Amino acid sequence: MDAVTGIILAGGESRRFGGGNKAFRMLDGRTMIDRVHDTVKSVCDDMVIVANTPLDYLGWNAVLATDLFDFRGSLVGIHAGLMSAGHEYAFISACDTPFLKQAVIKTIIGGIEDHIDVVVPEKKEGMEPLCAVYSRRCLEVIERHLHQGRMVIKAVYNKLRVRTISEKRLRAVDPDLVSFWNINTKEELEKAEAAIKAGRIS
């Protein structure tokens, strides 16, 4: 398997959580970013954390990066992460998917080939660009879009060689697709805690 950098988009303050950094919200005794970090690190060869407040992560064994453009957004975070990646390919994850499965990451990474720029899961609801592999070759196209103020990740795909991973293949290793469960609000965090306590998820 190719050497791959793991990149976590940690962001910063979350208004939907009522302020504070949602990456450090506790879930079943661990922060959300701890859960994501440990899963990604178990598969990837080195780590990058992209954060608005990188000083919060000084104790972590990871390269720390921050946005290089004045405006914020996931595409800006992807750009910052790829700029700091130690390998040609990087697996990118958001910090708010605490049930991300190692097997899902391996399945996505397994789609890497020299002629492919992006490997992205595609469920019936659409693609999952924040649980995907990107080549550093994407940087030129991403920078062009950012300089033009174009922030939609999927719009970048039109200029890149993209391989999708089908929902069928994803369900083979994650039947309930819990890897893609985003925790964006206090209510969703409470539902996740309840699911863990009920033994429906771990």
Swiss-Prot record:
Keywords: Cytoplasm, GTP-binding, Magnesium, Metal-binding, Molybdenum cofactor biosynthesis, Nucleotide-binding, Transferase. GO terms for cellular component: cytoplasm. It is an enzyme of class 2 (transferase). GO terms for biological process: Mo-molybdopterin cofactor biosynthetic process. It catalyses: Mo-molybdopterin + GTP + H(+) = Mo-molybdopterin guanine dinucleotide + diphosphate. CDD domains: MobA. One of its GO terms (molecular function) is GTP binding. Mg(2+) binds at D96. Disulfide bonds: none annotated. Its cofactor is Mg(2+). Gene3D superfamilies: Spore Coat Polysaccharide Biosynthesis Protein SpsA, Chain A. Its EC number is 2.7.7.77. Its main location: cytoplasm. It is found in: Cytoplasm. GTP binds at L9, A10, G11, K22, D70, D96. It holds the Pfam family NTP_transf_3. The keyword Transferase applies. It comes from the Bacteria. Transfers a GMP moiety from GTP to Mo-molybdopterin (Mo-MPT) cofactor (Moco or molybdenum cofactor) to form Mo-molybdopterin guanine dinucleotide (Mo-MGD) cofactor. HAMAP family: MobA. Belongs to the MobA family. The N-terminal domain determines nucleotide recognition and specific binding, while the C-terminal domain determines the specific binding to the target protein. Monomer. This is Molybdenum cofactor guanylyltransferase. It comes from Desulfosudis oleivorans (strain DSM 6200 / JCM 39069 / Hxd3). The gene is mobA.
